Amino acid sequence: MTVVVDYEMGNLLSVTKALEELGYKPSVTSDPRKILEEDLVVLPGVGAFRDAVRNLKEKGLFLALKERASLNRPILGICLGMQLFFTKSYEDGEYEGLDLIPGEVVRFQKAPKIPHMGWNNLVPVDTTHELFKNLPDYYVYFVHSYYAQTDSRYVLAYTEYGEKFPAAVRRGSIIGFQFHPEKSGPVGRQILKNLREML
């Protein structure tokens, strides 16, 4: 079973629908116990890092996600969900993240326009990686003003937008996409399908 975490930060319907279409069996939850029990946890999110951390803590989900990660059980973070994996964010201040992947979330400095919104090209570090097999192309959909800075060993793919930033990351069972696979058409669907086969 797959659970999509409801912490009042973003549109859960599009993520849930995309997962259903690919044969996942998603349910939406804000129950910390479910975070520990199910096969895959999906942490979506749109909005401010500070608000996301506050909501996760208030619902008891922050510690549940950290405990799940310590058990090496898979978590997928999408957009803000991915950013929450990192040590801290400098969005409107300085705020601690889940610290599941070492790194910091910072604002674009050289981007032609903020937010980075629309289609852009993924550049896989290794095009033979199972996450990127059978893709019709590498164009995916982004909406964000901040990005993660982390060690290259955790990066599966980069994207360029004024500056190079990690678009897909992995540390053990923790996988993050800065792009929205659920809004990325056939490419996003294939990536989610590949992820299912990896788990």
From Swiss-Prot:
Pfam families registered for this protein in UniProt: GATase
Gene3D superfamilies: 3.40.50.880
PROSITE patterns attached to this UniProt entry: GATASE_TYPE_1 (PS51273)
Keywords: Amino-acid biosynthesis, Cytoplasm, Glutamine amidotransferase, Histidine biosynthesis, Hydrolase, Lyase
Known EC number: 4.3.2.10, 3.5.1.2
Glutamine amidotransferase type-1 domain sequence ranges: 1-199
Any Gene Ontology CC annotation: cytoplasm
Subunit description: Heterodimer of HisH and HisF.
HAMAP family tied to this protein: HisH (MF_00278)
Protein known as: Imidazole glycerol phosphate synthase subunit HisH
Lineage of origin: Bacteria, Bacillati, Bacillota, Clostridia, Thermoanaerobacterales
